[in-house]
Amino acid sequence: MSSQKCASHLEIARLESLNFKISQLIYFVLIITTLFFTFFALKVIQKKCIFQLSTKILLYQNLFSANIHQIFLGITIVERLNIAFFKLNDKCIPLRPETNCQLYLEMFIAGLSGMVYGQTGLLFERACATFIKKYEKRKSLATGIITSIIVLLLSGSTARIIIWDDPLSEYQLACTSWPSKSRDRSTMFFSICTFISLFNLVISLLIRRHNEKLEYSTPFVVGPRFRKREVIDSTSTICFLTFFQFIFMFIYSFGVFLLGTIREIIGYEQYYFWVVWVYTIPFIAASFPILLIYRIRYSNTNRIMIIKQFTSTKQTQEDHIKQMKNVWN
């Protein structure tokens, strides 16, 4: 017990602040939201999904990563709120040795990076579906499994790469905090994540545009046109998800950079007052299953409306061709 290190008065002041408690409660609501909507997202992907098998595998991986991040964050939040509400009057609030937090941090960052790398994996899969001829079930399955394994390996090793030469000799209030001697690298990591998110957004737009251009090169036969529309719809969904991820990652990366730049000017209290609100990763994780459900249902509803239009309207052959062309635009 003699080697135990206690929280400083600044850390205690941060824990007892109303701003901190509100932010943690909001994060906790986002965590519950993620878990709740993930259950429905899995059902929607399985039963009402236009995605190919490889896309489904990678969507499962993205949902898994989002929930890993939220679960480990949730454990930390419960511990923090327990201290904030019930233990602030204790003589010593013990800090955790960074060596004891290594595995916890690696899992936490694996979930975070898995969401970012997973989007890149989805775009790689969409590129395969676009450019590989005869992208049948076997190729789709192999692409999905191999890509998801690569994403999981990369995300699982990210934290270890960042802290590889850190002696882990300090103490932290929570295991989700970066080791003190690796914080510069962690800032660089989030900047890279923002760049990757921007890259994903640009590539998704290019793939979507390419598919739309090639749509009319497909013979006007229901089967091939329907499959091409599936590729366009699924790519549009990935583009939609990537856009929101980029917005949230940019807010976090730029916010942390800006606050870090002016930290000495605004002081410790103001820095931590604002930094909890620019941590947007829980919003990324919570929005993913919600937006995914929305896009899948939107696509299915749109298709049903098109089919009803075709079956309820009497047309000449020329009118039918014109309407079909408008639908595929």
Swiss-Prot record:
Any single biological process term in GO: detection of chemical stimulus involved in sensory perception
Subcellular location: Membrane
Primary subcellular site in the record, as a coarse category: membrane
GO cellular component: membrane
Name of one Pfam family that matches: 7TM_GPCR_Sra
UniProt xrefs under InterPro entries: 7TM_GPCR_serpentine_rcpt_Sra, Nematode_rcpt-like_serp_alpha
Membrane-crossing segments per the record: 25-45, 57-77, 104-124, 144-164, 187-207, 238-258, 273-293
Recorded superkingdom: Eukaryota
Keyword annotations from UniProtKB, A to Z: Membrane, Transmembrane, Transmembrane helix
Family as reported in the entry's similarity comment: Belongs to the nematode receptor-like protein sra family.
Name assigned to this protein: Serpentine receptor class alpha-3
